[in-house]
Amino acid sequence: MTENRSKLNKELAQMLKGGVIMDVTSPEQAKIAEDAGACAVMALERIPADIRAAGGVSRMSDPKMIKGIQNAVSIPVMAKVRIGHFVEAQILEAIEIDYIDESEVLSPADDLNHIDKNKFNVPFVCGARDLGEALRRVAEGATMIRTKGEAGTGDIVQAVRHMRTMNSEIRRVVSLRQDELYVAAKDMQVPISLLQFVHDNGKLPVVNFAAGGVATPADAALMMQLGAEGVFVGSGIFKSGNPAKRAAAVVKAVTNYNNPSMLAELSEDLGEAMVGINADEISILMAERGK
């Protein structure tokens, strides 16, 4: 990927700021998401809650299914690949996907190495639990970061933890003296140039979205108030009682995240929320994958 292409990919990700990206498993769901105001959709054969329930090995979705969703909507379409599976990424780039999510939700293909995202023209989004993980993914070529949270649970606690951790580590880096940055870069195993950017600007070099456990308009607004620049919503929409209404409410909540009166209105009469899973009671944490 050339320097110009990298700059373009970062600018493309900037265009999604303030938006909601929704997991969808069919063209019909994709249309619901688009009509609700989603800025992009994530094409999946199974949403994270179903992946978690089924267990086993979870892989990239069928390209034919992804193409069906691409043909159904005019907004960007994303799709997930396994961590380290660069051939799945090559396939998605070949079908002209708009974004690739190298995702811990799927079973990792490589337990040591992530994809060298700099070799691709298509932009990548990756999950991170802290500043070190985020900057390592950016060094590999990611142009968007999201909290890992704990997908498929409807429990926001992990996403909150990851966002607060990242924010506190950014504040610490900003407070460092110039000569202390080198030690911090060594400890985090990240390039000094990326840590220098964080020190000078007080933020990541790429956009930072929230993901993992967002189930209500209040959850989405919480993550925005904590500093997220947008929100991914997975199982929380289409595992709920009224997906269309909940989807629209989450989109409006992200736009009006500092307006409690509006949030109260948006939270009314949404039907039953997804049945959640307490993240502390789970034996396999997806967020542990890919450091």
Swiss-Prot record:
Which EC class heads this enzyme's classification? lyase
| Active site, UniProt feature | 80
Which residues are recorded as binding D-ribose 5-phosphate? 23, 152, 213, 234-235
Keywords carried by this UniProt record: Lyase, Pyridoxal phosphate, Schiff base
One function term, GO molecular function aspect: pyridoxal 5'-phosphate synthase (glutamine hydrolysing) activity
| EC number annotated for this UniProt entry | 4.3.3.6
Q: Name one Pfam family in it.
A: SOR_SNZ
CDD domains named in the record: pdxS
What biological processes does GO assign it? amino acid metabolic process; pyridoxal phosphate biosynthetic process; pyridoxine biosynthetic process
**UniProt cross-references to SUPFAM superfamilies, sorted A to Z:** Ribulose-phoshate binding barrel
Listed binding positions for D-glyceraldehyde 3-phosphate are 164
Spell out the reaction equation it catalyses. Answer: aldehydo-D-ribose 5-phosphate + D-glyceraldehyde 3-phosphate + L-glutamine = pyridoxal 5'-phosphate + L-glutamate + phosphate + 3 H2O + H(+)
Q: Which family does it belong to?
A: Belongs to the PdxS/SNZ family.
Self-association state and partner proteins as the record states: In the presence of PdxT, forms a dodecamer of heterodimers.
Protein role = Catalyzes the formation of pyridoxal 5'-phosphate from ribose 5-phosphate (RBP), glyceraldehyde 3-phosphate (G3P) and ammonia. The ammonia is provided by the PdxT subunit. Can also use ribulose 5-phosphate and dihydroxyacetone phosphate as substrates, resulting from enzyme-catalyzed isomerization of RBP and G3P, respectively.
Q: What is this protein called?
A: Pyridoxal 5'-phosphate synthase subunit PdxS
Gene that this polypeptide is encoded by: pdxS
